[in-house]
Amino acid sequence: MNVDSRVFRFFLVFLILVVVASPGCVDNQPEPGNTSAGEGEVLTVFHAGSLSVPFEELEAEFEAQHPGVDVQREAAGSAQSVRKITELGKKADVLASADYALIPSLMVPEYADWYAAFARNQMILAYTNESKYGDEINTDNWYEILRRPDVRYGFSNPNDDPAGYRSQMVTQLAESYYNDDMIYDDLMLANTGMTLTTEENGTALIHVPASEEISPNTSKIMLRSMEVELSSALETGEIDYLYIYRSVAEQHGFEYVALPPAIDLSSLEYADNYSKVQVEMVNGEVVTGSPIVYGVTIPNNAENSELATEFVALLLGETGQQIFIENGQPPIVPAIAEGKDSMPEELQALVV
């Protein structure tokens, strides 16, 4: 991550503190209206799997406002979505990531000129009424439940999906919170090909090998490319527990263990604590623990930037905010932009 993006991360935390305290400040901002522009065209949207439900609703609303326009969405792990553009040369009109930092670190300046932070989330441990020991598990003992030999849990591939590397961060942070220095060893190191080293400054650095070398112990762990692919496994009882975002758990009606704010990557108050763990993906990219913030951009290779601008305006405006609230995911109001001067003018009024 370059210096500019590190500076943006600092100001992002500061600005979220300011704007969350005044959520009504965009009441008078313009909303995208009905238009015939783009009739008969296709709008391609790459987005995080955890955005599938709210983006399905955004798609329906956008298509209602734009008769004849077909919104085609591709859900994937956010890192994988970015690589479709940067490595595979695929074209997208909108890119929405579960970790905004992937945009400055992997896309700017060649593939994108700006990005906006628009929503937050938190990590939880989801389960169902059929999960083993579901009547026992709580915030204080969840890691002990996962240690039991007959319990199977799932998380997404850290190389592909922010929920995957955030699952590793949460588990490592749990060691200091619960004063148990074997939690990560027992749950992750003993059951996968991942390794861990401790830096001189005390930061825990988790190393993720090539995806085929993660080699999970399948009697304990189910690994998939993105976290929402594991939801059906939880529903059918193939796994007992799933590291996932709170919004996804609520959208699917799962029970869940709310993790302590000190480790669930949701709270600005604990940002310094989150930064004590890093994850190095197989491509060498190192991600530092931080509060969960989603980001959106219009890639430079967008084939329909006009419609993309209107879609992002819908996302960032009051309609999009309400959709996210109803789906259990707090919007950032107003959205916070980096590279604002490079944004389409229609979007500049919706961000700070």
UniProtKB/Swiss-Prot annotation:
Entry keywords, A to Z: Signal
The keyword Signal is assigned to this record: yes
Top-rank lineage group of the source organism: Archaea
GO molecular function: molybdate ion binding; tungstate binding
Residues annotated as signal peptide: 1-21
Protein family membership: Belongs to the bacterial solute-binding protein 1 family. WtpA subfamily.
NCBIfam families: PRK04168.1, tungstate_WtpA
Identification of the protein by name: Uncharacterized solute-binding protein MA_0280
Biological source species: Methanosarcina acetivorans (strain ATCC 35395 / DSM 2834 / JCM 12185 / C2A)
Higher taxonomy: Archaea, Methanobacteriati, Methanobacteriota, Stenosarchaea group, Methanomicrobia
